[in-house]
Amino acid sequence: MIVDKLLDDSRGGEGLLDAAGDCGLMTSPLNLAYFYGASPPSAPGAGDTGYLSAVPSAPGSPGSDSSDFSSTSSVSSCGAVESRPRGGARAERPQVEPHMGVGRQQRGPFQGVRVKNSVKELLLHIRSNKQKASGQPVDEFKTQSVNIEQLTDLKSAVSAVGKRKGPDPLSDGPVCKRPALLPSHFVTSPQTPTPGESMEDVRHSESKLDSSAALLQNIINIKNECNPVSLNTVQVSWMSPTVPQNSPRDQCQDFHGGQAFSPPQKYQPFQVSGSPQMMDQASMYQYSPQTQNMQQPPPLPPQQQHQQNYPHNSPLQFSPYSRMSQSPKYDSNLFDTHEPQFCTGQSFVSLLTGPGEPESLAVPVPAPTSIPPQTETQLQTFSLMPSNACEAVVGVHDVGSHSLGTSLSLQNIMGSPMNTTQLGKSFFQWQVEQEESKLANIPQDQFLARDGDGDTFLHIAVAQGRRALSYVLARKMNALHMLDIKEHNGQSAFQVAVAANQHLIVQDLVNLGAQVNTTDCWGRTPLHVCAEKGHSQVLQAIQKGAVRSNQFVDLEATNYDGLTPLHCAVVAHNAVVHELQRNRQSHSPEVQDLLLRNKSLVDTIKCLIQMGAAVEAKDRKSGRTALHLAAEEANLELIRLFLELPSCLSFVNAKAYNGNTALHVAASLQYRVTQLDAVRLLMRKGADPSTRNLENEQPVHLVPDGPVGEQIRRILKGKSIQQRAPPY
């Protein structure tokens, strides 16, 4: 409606176009205060400007038609008739504003900024140039208005680039005179048009391709003015010979029609202060943008490695290899691997010699043959550089001092006087050698000498726990076949070691051939001594030594009292239990010692059972089993241990020579705290309360009087078990 009024009241449509051209509102940002309706009313006498100022123009987008028409209608009252070129719009602006009656007023609050569209101006400029060149009159109003036709050139250019039928011209010159800027693999091969397309369409699109490419190149140049380089991207100039390292501004290069590539972070130059080879690691790599795959080529001969020159600051070269291929000039990174590889002997020698000299040390160091493999591992730790690093520094001649120091240190270590026979030996073996050197000049008859008790040097050494001396003496006496010589109590050195709880010496003596079933003057074997004293470790040493020396261990051997080692162990444990029941002070040192002895005896009994000792074995005098002996003291721990065995039913009702079972023995006890529990445990495990002895007595007949006796009788008669309730 406003446009119609302006056309009726003003001097005509041409004046409107001229006014728009004079003010130049479409080619420059609008006056913000006047655009948002914040300007003061026009001065009186300005014609129709008062009406125009009273009607606020709605704000629109920078490319909207409403803003163009509103600005055009606002400027129509300027009164300018003659049309001026677009370049002079800003120059004539101060002369137009006084006629508008606006002047420079104080603007309202800032509400936004209208950014000029560079792409839109470029399209309008190109369109106006083409119309001037063709001789057609330039229509300023149609040029500045926003229509869909303005984007047709851009759309055609994009579509032509997306569906080109031949090589894409990327420069403004003729096609026949353009230089080839891209490699052959970047250029798309010509395609044959499909049957649906005609040759005329192809020629028509090729005719427009030149102007469209120039338009697209201008748009790309405008977009690249802001240098859109991200923090994670490094643009490499593939055309320039050198790339400065400390100029990030120069790294942003325009590659026409291509893409900026940067090597991966893993293969960036490693900046260290050292040899030039390490400082110029970037020159040792060639990066392939297609594959991004780096592999190590096969190593070169040493002569070629000396003659090969690595240029400094060499430019990055593009090598179009396939995905599975590798570059023949690629050298692996010295710091690529995290696991250090030891240099071989050949590469280590090459550090000490020149390129033309033979790879041999100046001072030959003979490698001793008697050195165990441990020394080789120690000597390999001199070079922690990778193998390729050792080969890389061969051509450097300033490493002579380091090589000399390394060779001297190697010579000192290799040539130092050391006793190689002592390497890898334990302290015990060293002690044996020392004792042998001490006893080298002693005659053999001195080893068989005895004191007043009949003890030899071996007996005394074993009793003192001197293992190395005992081993040397036992080896010398074994050569004389006098290893089992006994003292006045009939104990051999082996039995003395068992009594002294020297399990290591026991194992050495058994390995040398000591008899494990020998007896003393009391008829005790070494197993009896272990069982009485609770030496479980000595028992295990005897078992291991007997297996190695192929000896038989008699577990059922009896002493002069007719007791087996298991019987002796049970009797010793009963004594400890009795002492614990008598002593009420649980924190006294005596009780602590008793507890330790109790534990050691239980371990010994378990070890004997594990070795194969029979629980049902009877003693020679009374015919009692180990269960009978445990029931005599109401030893709940041992009774439970024996009754938990799989073969408990074979000895739970075993009778002694007087016909008593273990239940008879437990029921007849007096003044025992654990008597009631022992009887109950035997009854639960299958003991028969109806069994009679040789005097025709049952266990219930042997129960003493008293409150505890009454409870035992009830248990034996089965009255302690609650009767079942009738089902009805």
Curated annotation (Swiss-Prot):
Gene3D superfamilies found in the cross-reference section: Ankyrin repeat-containing domain (1.25.40.20)
Keyword Repeat assigned: yes
GO-annotated cellular components: cytoplasmic ribonucleoprotein granule; nuclear speck; nucleus
UniProt biased composition (Polar residues): 241-250, 268-288, 316-330
Segments for region (Disordered): 45-107, 241-334
OCA domain segment(s): 107-129
Main location class: nucleus
Transmembrane segments: none
A Pfam cross-reference name: Ank_2
Domain of life: Eukaryota
Motif range (Nuclear localization signal): 163-178
Mutant lacking the gene: phenotype: Mice have splenocytes with defective proliferation in response to LPS but not to anti-CD40, IL-4 and anti-IgM. Though mice grew normally after birth, some of them started to develop atopic dermatitis-like skin lesions with acanthosis and lichenoid changes at the age of 4-5 weeks. All mice developed the disease by the age of 10 weeks. 5-week-old mice show pathological changes in the conjunctiva, including a heavy lymphocyte infiltration into the submucosa and loss of goblet cells in the conjunctival epithelium.
Ranges of Low complexity composition bias in the record: 53-82, 303-315
Cross-referenced SUPFAM superfamilies: Ankyrin repeat
Protein's UniProt keywords contain Transcription regulation: yes
Location of the region described as Interaction with NFKB1/p50 in the Swiss-Prot/TrEMBL record: 414-728
Single GO molecular function: transcription coregulator activity
Tissues expressed in: Expressed in kidney, liver, lung and heart. Expressed at very low levels in skeletal muscle, spleen and brain.
Placement of ANK repeats on the sequence: 453-482, 489-518, 522-551, 561-589, 591-617, 622-651, 658-691
Region of interest: Required for transcriptional activity: 329-403
Function, in words: Involved in regulation of NF-kappa-B transcription factor complexes. Inhibits NF-kappa-B activity without affecting its nuclear translocation upon stimulation. Inhibits DNA-binding of RELA and NFKB1/p50, and of the NF-kappa-B p65-p50 heterodimer and the NF-kappa-B p50-p50 homodimer. Also seems to activate NF-kappa-B-mediated transcription. In vitro, upon association with NFKB1/p50 has transcriptional activation activity and, together with NFKB1/p50 and RELA, is recruited to LCN2 promoters. Promotes transcription of LCN2 and DEFB4.
Designated name of the protein: NF-kappa-B inhibitor zeta
